[in-house]
């Protein structure tokens, strides 16, 4: 069969990978099967506990708390960029380019470990469907690292063609890992700020929450401020604190969390926020919690979202 005769079959295969109006396509269907598969579930608990043996302050840094967003997407640029650049240089003639490609591969191998460590730290505080995809994502990237390490070794021994072949295989595998990472971030919303929509949906009108006398002292209750579900805490001093109820990390219900030292601790993954300003004093949350202004009129507690924090447009 001539190659031209195979083109329709190749095109049909490619089209089957893409989503259609009435079905997701093979790629998405495969990833969704990974989400639902329980085959690797016995590994999830031990791996999570191993990650949680790291000191909390170190985990906060690895999560990206100082940045205000996950650190993993930042660090993965180093190995991915290095390896992709090396692949381009491998296609160009010249001894200097071969040496530069080897140096880039070495840089990618050296920076893969910190990128992976931030990824594992984030992974340990996800939901099971996310953890399943994340585990395959990590395996793909680990395989790519092994291939690139082999590629570097072959190059150092003068076996350039073998080094290029291993590098190409590594680039293919790390691209699969990257695609799964994109699914994790954009389809499954891992690493996203789950309280970001509050600033867009909340209005700045005053809304009645409850009578002050009906609010228990030192215990969180759930209420509504317009379309936003909030947690309300009446302190012993009489001050009323109102925060968005859904945790910025993974949308856990803060109103069911523990109150201690002027903070609330999320019942799902332990993110801790100050009641007075919503600051995330401890991760895994990397973003603070939206806070509402409050006032008491004739014994009635009212709340509104601050005008300066409102986001629209």
Protein language model features and the residues they cover:
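Short amphipathic, positively biased membrane-proximal segments
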Residues: 1-313
């Amino acid at each position: 069969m001539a190659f031209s005769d195979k083109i329709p079959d190749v095109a049909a295969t490619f089209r089957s990978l893409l989503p259609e109006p009435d079905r997701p396509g093979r790629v998405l269907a495969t990833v969704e099967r990974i989400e639902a598969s329980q085959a690797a579930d016995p590994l999830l608990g031990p791996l999570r506990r191993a990650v949680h043996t790291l000191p909390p302050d170190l985990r906060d840094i690895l999560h990206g708390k100082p940045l205000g967003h996950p650190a993993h997407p930042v660090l993965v640029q180093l190995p991915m960029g290095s390896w992709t650049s090396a692949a381009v240089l491998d296609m160009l003639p010249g001894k200097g380019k071969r040496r530069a490609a080897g140096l880039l591969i070495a840089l990618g191998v050296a920076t893969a470990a910190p990128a992976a460590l931030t990824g594992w730290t984030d992974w340990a505080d996800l939901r099971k469907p996310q953890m399943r995809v994340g585990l395959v994502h990590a395996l793909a990237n680990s395989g790519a690292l092994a291939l690139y390490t082999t590629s570097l070794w072959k190059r150092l021994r003068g076996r350039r063609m073998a080094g290029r072949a291993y590098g190409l295989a590594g680039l293919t595998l790390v691209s699969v890992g990257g695609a799964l990472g994109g699914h994790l971030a954009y389809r499954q919303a891992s690493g996203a700020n789950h309280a970001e929509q509050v600033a867009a949906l909340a209005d700045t009108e005053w809304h009645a929450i409850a009578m002050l006398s009906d609010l228990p002292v030192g215990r969180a209750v759930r209420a509504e401020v317009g379309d936003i579900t909030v947690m309300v805490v009446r302190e012993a001093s009489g001050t009323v604190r109102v925060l968005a109820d859904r945790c910025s990390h993974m949308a856990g219900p803060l109103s069911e969390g523990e109150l201690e030292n002027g903070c609330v601790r999320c019942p799902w993954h332990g993110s801790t926020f100050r009641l007075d300003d919503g600051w995330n004093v401890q991760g895994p949350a990397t973003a603070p919690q939206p806070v509402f202004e409050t006032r008491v009129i004739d014994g009635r507690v009212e709340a509104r979202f601050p005008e300066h924090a409102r986001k629209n447009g």
